Amino acid sequence: MRSDVSEIEKETKCPECGSDDLRGDYERAEIVCGKCGLVIDDNLVDMGPEWRAFDHEQRDKRTRVGAPITYTIHDKGLSTMIDWRNKDIYGRDIPARNRAQWYRLRKWQRKIRISGATERNLAFALSELDRDSSRLGLPRSVREAASMVYRRAVENKLIRGRSIEGVVAASLYAACRKCNVPRTLDEIAEVSRVSKKEVGRTYRFLTRELNIKLPPTSPVDYVPRFASELGLSGEVQSKAIEIIEMAMENGLTSGRGPTGVAAAALYIASVLLGEHKTQRDVAEVAGVTEVTIRNRYKELTEQLDLGVTL
């Protein structure tokens, strides 16, 4: 008896017509030839759960497995915790004479979960990483990637002599670039309580020692976030991206900060499409000076002949 539809489709052809167009029907537990209709196997096993759920609440109640493994927790989410509420499995209150015992059990359980210097380091660092990620509004994928970078740094003994906060910030910056969720060094430094210089220095050290290859950040990556914060339309975003792509083709972005180019392109696009924003507004969102925007603006309008004047 076969239970893997893909295995049958790869290894078997229809004995009647020779066609390899085999289709699985889980409702009837059959493998059927899509050309002649011959039933090739009628003992297909459904490997899914035996229960059905029609919403998230039912799915959470009926599933019998725990949360998936995550690198954002020092023990990867594999351990359990004693609930802080003094209730048993049936929801009844624990007798007062047993509460002191439960308090001691919780205390020992917390100590057991974090045993050793490495575990303590990971527990503190990953909580710091979660705090910084929340303040930056980063998605789950970036948090997982940053946690993996930090774990690699710990495994390779790269933490010694450096602050945990600095390594966490550098790991976050590397993860943002890897996942194409750009954040500037200034933004990372602002939430991490370490200087921009230290974040940059630690980032370069980690990428060199861990052999992390990251592509250069493109100005296009910053456009959606800046446009959203400025309240600009999708048409302005598209026009700004078009301007940036033209600038890249003409070599106008080489040696220029991506945030400055993105800010200038958005400013030009907003003027062209009648959704004008002041240079000060754009500069504040992009984290650059008004002088930078004017310089990039002048370069883009003159070299690309966009027909816009200050």
Swiss-Prot record:
The keyword Acetylation belongs to this UniProt entry's keyword annotation: no
Chain positions of Sequence repeats: 127-210, 221-302
GO CC annotations, alphabetized: transcription preinitiation complex
Keywords from the named record: Metal-binding, Repeat, Transcription, Transcription regulation, Zinc, Zinc-finger
Repeat listed as a keyword: yes
InterPro entries hit by this protein: Cyclin-like_dom (IPR013763), Cyclin-like_sf (IPR036915), TFIIB (IPR000812), TFIIB_arc (IPR023484), TFIIB_CS (IPR023486), TFIIB_cyclin (IPR013150), Znf_TFIIB (IPR013137)
GO molecular function: DNA-binding transcription factor activity; TBP-class protein binding; zinc ion binding
ZnF segments: TFIIB-type: 9-41
Domain of life: Archaea
Pfam families, per the entry: TFIIB, Zn_Ribbon_TF
One of the protein's GO biological processes: transcription preinitiation complex assembly
Stored PROSITE patterns: TFIIB, ZF_TFIIB
Positions that bind Zn(2+): 14, 17, 33, 36
NCBIfam families, sorted: PRK00423.1
Summary of the function given for this chain in its UniProt record: Stabilizes TBP binding to an archaeal box-A promoter. Also responsible for recruiting RNA polymerase II to the pre-initiation complex (DNA-TBP-TFIIB).
The family this protein is said to belong to: Belongs to the TFIIB family.
The protein's name: Transcription initiation factor IIB
